[in-house]
Swiss-Prot record:
GO terms for cellular component: cytosol; Golgi membrane. PANTHER family: CGI-141-RELATED/LIPASE CONTAINING PROTEIN (PTHR21493), VESICLE TRANSPORT PROTEIN GOT1 (PTHR21493:SF247). It is found in: Golgi apparatus membrane. This is Vesicle transport protein GOT1. The chain crosses the membrane at residues 12-32, 35-55, 71-91, 96-116. It holds the Pfam family Got1. Homodimer. No interactions with STL1, STL2, CESA1, CESA3, CESA4, CESA6, CESA7 or CESA8. Keywords: Golgi apparatus, Membrane, Transmembrane, Transmembrane helix. It comes from the Eukaryota. The keyword Transmembrane applies. It is a multi-pass membrane protein. GO terms for biological process: endoplasmic reticulum to Golgi vesicle-mediated transport; retrograde transport, endosome to Golgi.
């Protein structure tokens, strides 16, 4: 079972993940700059690997139910590197959603604890959507 304490590698991993998201966002803002998007992807993957560990990351990306997401994220990355940033980013987005769809319930619980957002998420329609996915485990 993974340790919940924040050691230095996990802190660095979270920082790299944040920078990866930031660089990808900058790449989209700067008219789909393939260099920034590729750098963001590398930083994101390195950050996820350092945050959860090398072996758990390999197990996560090679699980049978995550295979479709891993392939589409990888092909999207290759499309970005080879000069098709718009199509690559679309394919990466699909892969990201497939890979990390199991984390949405955990994220929803975290967001409900933020003061203004928590009130918004407690509204009946939104709460019924969130309750449907509550109780699932995080897939790591």
């Amino acid at each position: 079972m993974a340790s919940l304490e924040m050691n230095d590698l996990k802190k660095i991993g979270l920082g790299l993940t944040g920078f990866g998201v930031f660089f990808t966002f900058l790449g989209v803002i700067f008219v789909f700059d393939k260099g920034l998007i590729a750098m963001g992807n590398i930083l994101f993957l390195a950050g996820v690997t350092l945050t959860i560990g090398i072996n758990p990351a390999i197990q996560f990306f090679t699980k049978r139910q995550n295979f479709k997401g891993t392939i589409s994220f990888g092909l999207g990355f290759l499309l970005v590197v080879f000069g098709w940033p718009i199509f690559g980013l679309l394919l990466e987005s699909y892969g990201f959603l497939v890979l990390f769809s199991g984390f949405w319930p955990t994220l929803a619980v975290f967001l409900q604890r933020i003061p203004l957002l928590g009130w918004l998420l407690q509204q009946p329609y939104i709460r019924s959507l969130l309750d449907r996915y509550r109780g699932r485990r995080v897939p790591v």
